[in-house]
C-alpha cells in the first residue's frame, strides 16, 4: 500500500513583489482632491514629472518634483502617495508610512493608494492594518484590479492564519475574474495546507490550465493525485517535474 504523507508548502507570497507591477505609476491619472485649488494643473504636472523620475528610479529628482507639487497643493493625494513610494524605496519606512496615511486621509476613495499602502504594511509584517486597508479598498466596485485586490486580501488573512476569511476572499476573487491564476493557486495551497485535498484539486487544475506551473504546484499535484488514487495522473505530473 502506498502511504501518503502531507507535505507542507509555504502559502505566503511577498505581496509587495506581486503588487509592484500595479503601482500607481501605470496610467498616472491625476487626482481630484478638492484642496488642490491653488494651481491644480501645476500640481498635477509636477506629480506626473515625479512619477516619471520614480519609474526610472531617479529618486532625488522624483523627490524634488513631488515636493514642488505639494508646495502647490499640500493635500494632493497622488503626490502624497508617490512621495510615500519614494521614501519606501529609500528605506525611510516611518516617512513612507506617514505619507501613505496622508494620501488616504486626503482622498479616502483613492483605492490604488490603499492597495499600495497595504503592500507596504504587509512588507513590514503589519498584517492586521494591511488587511484593514485592503478591506476598505475592496469596497470600490469600480476598481480595475479588484480581483487582484481580493487575492491580496486573501493572502493577508492567510498570513494571520484566519483561514475562513482567506478562503472567502479568494473565492470572491475568482467570481470577479475566473482567469485569475494566482488566486486559484493560493486557494489550492490553502486547502492543501489544511488537508482538504478534494477541495484543493479543482482550483489547482484551474491554475495549471491558466499558468506555467512551477515546482511547488506540480509537487502539490503529485501529492493530491496520489491521495485521490489517480496514480497515472500523479505519474504524469511527476514526469513534468522531471523536465521542469
Per-range role (PLM):
Residues 55, 89-90, 123-124, 140, ...:
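Register position in tetratricopeptide repeats
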Residues 37-98, 132:
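Post-signal-peptide N-terminal segment of Sec-exported extracytoplasmic proteins
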Residues 42, 76, 110, 144-146, ...:
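Residue-level recognition of tetratricopeptide repeat
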